[in-house]
Amino acid sequence: AQGIRSEDALSRGIKIKRMTSSNPYRIPGLELIDHTFEVPLDHGNPGGRKINVFVREVCDLDPKSKDKPFLLFLQGGPGFRAPLPIRKEGWLKRALTEFRVLMYDTRGNGLSSAVDYQALVLEGDARAQADYLKHFRQDNIVRDAEAIRAEMSPDTPWSTIGQSYGGWCTMTYLSLHPEGLKECFIFGGVPGLDRTAREIYEGTFPFVEERNRQYFEKFPMDKERLVKLARHLQENDVRFPNGDRVIPQLVQLLGLKFGFAHTAEEIHFLLEEAFVQAGDQEIVSHTFKMGLQAALRFDTNPIFAILHEAIYAQGSASAWACDAVQKESYPHFNNFEDFLFYGEMVFPWMFDEISELKGMKEAANILADYDGWPALYDKDVLSRNTVPVACAVYANDMFVNARFSRETIESVPNMKAFYTSEYEHCGLRVGGEHLFSRLIDLGRGEVER
């Protein structure tokens, strides 16, 4: 793979431009300042095209907050904006006792030159679209972040907190610009440094099968419901309000919820309302169609689909890895007489069935075939890591293989882990203040594990 440490604008001494910073404004318990920066689309060509990157600064109402150091939040995904600071609670409440928190909309998301089909078609043909999207992985997310740090905190490294894919970004940050980091906290997101997309899915499918077993053990009545629903959708032209056809495979994608606490119950209660009586026949209910559509975030968060496998690619093509593993080793997932849910998985057929993705199909195939992806981690730099990194690793995490996480943690100095089966992938949201406090203590040596 092409090396990660390619020259960027920052290494050339070229500063980015802060376009705007709002006046402080308040919501209950919080003061917010919105910042927008202009950064190079390609950090290797700082004089070329620019995009915007948005960061929301969040402080408590203590007048001394402006003197607190920064904590940069790296969001999960890929393809999601930073959390919206609605109220002072959970991990944010703990963070604000000693930090100014920066909610960072990574490039392509939220208010940071968001990628959607309406914008992407303006890039030109499928090749131009794919070339544009190649710039939206974690390496450039990190380059943006470090350039912003050089502007907002030029003399002081900052701390980071990474949720899920935010941990991928953290490990890339430690590879590219460790000098910008004081300490890092990772929740359910330590990647295997050398693991390919294919290896990821070979490890994921057994977890998903087990979650299916647990689900149908808890809700045995749902097997018959799902088989009935799948047959109905195969035999009838059922449509979402936006005109997309409702197919059984989209129902299978509800299994994404298995990776979060208490969300299997949400699936069960949604299935209760799958049908409604219309005269002398049953039809799929509007309630179910709207619930299913709301659960599938691919239409509003297309990066989650189009770059999902690319976050593992380093010098090789992702090649629709999940689809290949499913067809070769788990063909029974296609048998609707024995209905099984998928997990966090992306398939090429989605680009035929989901409106917002249809126009990205050619670009998605180009990206899946692309084998020139540069490296995302520098194992030599990581082998000499001096930045304290504290991680929460969830033993039963359906999204991030704990065995792969352990491989990385054991190979990188100054990484400490709290291994637990108490939380699912959403531990930061559920464990909040308590779990973040535990990782702070772990990272700073107050506790051993």
Model-identified regions with their sequence ranges:
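Conserved strand-to-loop "acid loop" that flanks and positions the catalytic carboxylate
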Residues: 390-396
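C-terminal structured domains
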Residues: 391, 409-413
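Alpha/beta-hydrolase fold active-site neighborhood
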Residues: 237-370
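Gly/Pro-rich cap/lid or specificity-loop segments adjacent to the active site
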Residues: 10-242, 349, 356-364, 374-382, ...
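Eukaryotic N-terminal low-complexity, Ser/Thr- and Lys/Arg-rich leader segments
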Residues: 1-8
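Alpha-helix boundary/capping residues
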Residues: 274, 412-415
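Short alpha-helix in the alpha/beta-hydrolase fold that links the catalytic acid
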Residues: 270-272, 401-408
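Hydrophobic, well-ordered secondary-structure elements that form the walls
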Residues: 55, 394, 408
